[in-house]
Structure formats: structure tokens, C-alpha cells
């Protein structure tokens, strides 16, 4: 396995882990500080987007705006922001409201299967045995882990399936669509502009100008974690990892996010999990090992487009 791919695996895992940590902060802000979560989603995307674009501008100058010189790339950026970032977050939020985080998370983690189907139909790329096993383990492991969060198959109603599956589509688009843009313009500017696009769309959809939160030092700490670690670091790390190891492996490895959320919820908020949850963690960790072993095998030559996603 090349060093380039090792870094990609580490970055993908880092992005998923800090995203899970931000979920604990969101739970704290919503449950203990009465924060309007729609306001929080809008605020974190716009704030993180502005900070990310400013950072990219300080590093790269006006070249960060070169993506807008191409109509094709501008359209690709809009697709990434609207049908990737914004879609996966808004629909995930809707699924949580209707059925709880457990069902919403399980449905969202159908994304790796969707990516594999897309790769097969678009490029004729058949999934490896390791990828198929990893997708199954990740999905079953997530179901086991979410069993501690009130997961019940009775909650699978038509509206829940609609929003949950749309959330998975959003994750798939978010993982696949920007890869060429990331390689051309760099991860940071593309992620920053994608956040701004999705943030402004969230402002229009939610129209929530007030947080209604109880503000103290811990509210500020929670917001900092959500914006900086859970948005800026997690999005940039995950997509840089996807650029290095591909969308399928990246989406599978992102299933460590529920483990991170479960551990932090247990340590900081007193959440509990049983042996079924531990079994789910073991299954998800097994996917990391399988992906790493897959990467050690000689990779067959692929077409340029298929290899970039």
C-alpha cells in the first residue's frame, strides 16, 4: 500500500471520527442548551464556509476563484453544494425528526451500496469481494450500534424511507461528484465554496434567524466544536481522503462515525450501549482492516475516470 493511500485512509477516518464528535456536541446543544438545530446547521455551514474560503485565499490568493472561470466546473460545484452537502444534511435532519437518529443513520449508510451501483453502471467497475463484505459489515454493524439509540424496524414508514434514502443519495453525490474538482483546484477551496452554497440554501429552507439557546461558556465550546472540528476539519479531511483512496472506500470507512459518537456520548453524556452495540463496533472496525488489506493487493488498471472516483 502506497504512503499516499495510507494518508488517505487516515484522513478519511479522522474526518468520520471528528464528525461523530460533533454529533455529541449537537446533542448537547439541542438537549441541554435548547438550541434551535436548524439555526445551528445554517450557522455552522456559513461560518465554516467563510473561514475555509478565507484560509484558502490567504494561502492561494485569487486562484481560489479560478473554479468560476469554467461554466462546467461552476455547475459541478453547485451540484456538489446543493445535491451533495445540502441534500445529505437537510434530508438527514428530516429523517431524524421523523424517526430518530438510529433509523436516519442506518438509511444514510446505504450510500456505499449506491456508490458501488453507480460505479458499475457508469464505468463498468465491479466491486471487489472485500468491498462487498465491507459494505455488508458496515451496514449490519451500524444497525447493531444504533440499536442503543431506539432503533426499531417499526419506524420504517414511507416518509422516513423517502428522507432517509435521499440522505444516502446526498452522501453518495457528496463523495463522488467533487473528486475531479478536488484534483483540479484543491480540496480546501472546493469544500469552502460547497459549504457556502449549502449554507445559504439552508438559510432559505430553514429561515431560522434565532438560536433560542441558553448561552454560556459550554454553549460556545459546543459551537466551536461543531464549526471547527465537526465541519471544517471533518469535511476537508474526509474529502481529501476520498481524493486519495476513492469514493467507495471513503464511504465505507466513514462508518466509524457512529463509533465515535457512541463513545463520546457514553463518556460525556452518560449514554449507554450493550453487547450488541459492541458487536456492531467490532463489525465496523473489521471494515477498516478489510479495506487496508485490499489496498495492499496489486490494483488492476482502470480507466482514468473510474480511477478518480
Locate the predicted segments by residue.
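C-terminal-most transmembrane helix of multi-pass membrane proteins
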Residues: 1, 45, 146-148, 219, ...
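Glycine-/small-residue-enriched transmembrane alpha-helix faces in small-molecule transporters
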Residues: 1-43, 153-180, 200, 303-309
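Juxtamembrane helix-entry segments on the extracytoplasmic side of multipass membrane proteins
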Residues: 4-9, 33-42, 67-73, 147-170, ...
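Helix-helix packing/entry segments at the starts of transmembrane helices
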Residues: 16, 43, 85, 89, ...
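Membrane-interface helix-cap regions at the ends of transmembrane helices
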Residues: 21, 28, 48-70, 139-155, ...
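Alpha-helical transmembrane segments of compact multi-pass small-molecule transporters, enriched
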Residues: 47, 51, 107-121, 136-137, ...
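Specific transmembrane alpha-helical segments of multi-pass solute transporters/efflux pumps
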Residues: 57-102, 144, 227-245
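Loop-to-transmembrane alpha-helix entry segments
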Residues: 108, 124-144, 154-161, 216-220, ...
Amino acid at each position: 500500500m502506497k504512503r499516499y493511500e495510507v494518508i488517505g485512509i487516515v484522513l478519511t477516518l479522522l474526518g468520520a471520527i471528528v464528525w461523530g464528535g460533533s454529533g455529541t456536541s449537537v446533542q448537547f446543544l439541542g438537549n441541554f442548551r435548547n438550541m434551535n438545530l436548524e439555526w445551528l446547521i445554517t450557522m455552522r455551514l456559513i461560518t465554516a464556509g467563510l473561514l475555509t474560503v478565507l484560509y484558502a485565499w490567504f494561502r492561494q490568493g485569487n486562484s481560489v476563484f479560478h473554479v468560476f472561470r469554467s461554466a462546467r466546473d461552476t455547475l459541478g460545484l453547485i451540484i456538489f453544494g446543493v445535491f451533495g452537502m445540502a441534500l445529505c444534511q437537510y434530508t438527514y435532519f428530516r429523517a431524524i425528526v421523523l424517526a430518530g437518529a438510529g433509523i436516519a443513520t442506518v438509511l444514510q449508510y446505504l450510500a456505499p451500496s449506491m456508490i458501488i451501483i453507480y460505479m458499475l453502471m457508469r464505468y463498468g467497475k465491479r466491486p471487489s469481494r472485500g468491498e462487498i463484505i465491507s459494505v455488508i459489515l458496515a451496514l449490519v454493524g451500524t444497525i447493531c450500534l444504533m440499536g442503543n439509540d431506539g432503533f426499531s424496524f417499526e419506524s420504517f414508514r414511507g416518509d422516513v424511507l423517502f428522507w432517509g434514502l435521499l440522505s444516502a443519495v446526498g452522501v453518495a453525490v457528496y463523495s463522488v461528484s467533487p473528486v475531479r474538482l478536488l484534483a483540479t483546484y484543491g480540496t480546501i477551496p472546493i469544500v469552502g465554496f460547497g459549504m457556502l452554497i449549502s449554507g445559504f440554501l439552508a438559510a432559505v429552507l430553514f429561515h431560522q434567524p434565532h438560536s433560542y439557546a441558553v448561552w454560556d461558556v459550554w454553549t460556545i465550546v459546543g459551537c466551536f466544536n461543531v464549526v471547527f472540528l465537526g465541519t471544517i476539519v471533518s469535511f476537508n479531511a474526509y474529502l481529501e481522503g476520498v481524493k486519495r483512496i476513492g469514493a467507495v472506500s471513503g464511504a465505507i470507512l466513514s462508518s466509524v462515525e457512529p463509533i465515535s459518537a457512541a463513545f463520546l456520548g457514553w463518556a460525556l453524556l452518560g449514554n449507554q450501549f450493550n453487547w450488541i452495540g459492541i458487536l456492531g463496533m467490532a463489525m465496523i472496525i473489521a471494515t477498516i482492516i478489510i479495506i487496508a488489506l485490499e489496498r495492499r493487493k496489486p490494483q488492476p488498471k482502470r480507466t482514468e475516470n473510474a480511477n478518480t472516483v
